[in-house]
């Protein structure tokens, strides 16, 4: 029996473990394809166009914005990043599921354009644990950590836009819950091509 492809969106506050969960899901979940973003930043050593990112120049990216070619896009410092609509739709139309790991603002943009997606909010067990994770990864200044924690409280206000909440207290337990969500969504009648 054929079924429609499903867009699975995981998002949550910075430092909650989205990247770790994404990698584990892709490693262990059959027929789950990663959404590839477009960016104007130069490719780093070892990055491959079409595998890590779609690398485009500013003019091309702006043209794609004008053509409504993105499910979402954002400017991060001097670079632009976006999720190409065509890439995602092509996979979905071929019955392939797509996983998109994104920040909360991006997820809200995607929800507007693709409300049929499955939106999963990843949340820490508490703010103290999130602070510990942010400090432990050693990538952020104290000011940045405090700003991220303040943003986390604000981001919780958007929880109603999501279909599921998964608390990432233990990576294996969170992974098990997301896997259960994927299995259940794949079995829903609305996602099956019955004719």
UniProtKB/Swiss-Prot annotation:
InterPro entries: GK/Ca_channel_bsu, Guanylate_kin-like_dom, Guanylate_kinase, Guanylate_kinase_CS, P-loop_NTPase. It catalyses: GMP + ATP = GDP + ADP. The keyword Ribonucleoprotein does not apply. Its EC number is 2.7.4.8. Keywords: ATP-binding, Cytoplasm, Kinase, Nucleotide-binding, Transferase. ATP binds at residues 12-19. Its main location: cytoplasm. It is found in: Cytoplasm. CDD domains: GMPK (cd00071). GO terms for cellular component: cytosol. Residues 5-183 form the Guanylate kinase-like domain. Belongs to the guanylate kinase family. Essential for recycling GMP and indirectly, cGMP. This is Guanylate kinase. The lineage of its organism: Bacteria, Bacillati, Bacillota, Clostridia, Eubacteriales.
């Amino acid at each position: 029996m054929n079924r429609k492809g499903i867009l699975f969106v995981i998002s949550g506050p910075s430092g909650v473990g989205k990247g770790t969960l994404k990698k584990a899901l892709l490693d262990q979940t059959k027929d789950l394809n990663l959404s590839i973003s477009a960016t104007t930043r130069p490719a780093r050593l070892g990055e491959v166009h079409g595998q890590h990112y779609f690398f485009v120049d500013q003019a091309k990216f702006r043209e794609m914005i004008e053509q409504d070619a993105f499910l979402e896009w954002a400017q991060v410092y001097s670079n632009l990043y976006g999720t190409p609509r065509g890439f995602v739709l092509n996979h979905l139309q071929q019955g392939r599921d797509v996983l998109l790991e994104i920040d909360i603002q991006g997820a809200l943009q995607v929800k507007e354009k693709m409300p049929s997606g499955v939106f999963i909010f990843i949340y820490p067990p508490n703010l103290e644990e999130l602070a510990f994770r942010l400090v432990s990864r050693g990538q952020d200044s104290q000011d940045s950590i405090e700003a991220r924690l303040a943003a986390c409280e604000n981001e919780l206000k958007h929880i109603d836009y999501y279909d599921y909440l998964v608390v990432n207290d233990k990576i294996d337990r969170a992974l098990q819950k997301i896997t259960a969500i994927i299995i259940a969504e794949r079995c829903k009648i609305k996602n099956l091509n019955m004719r």
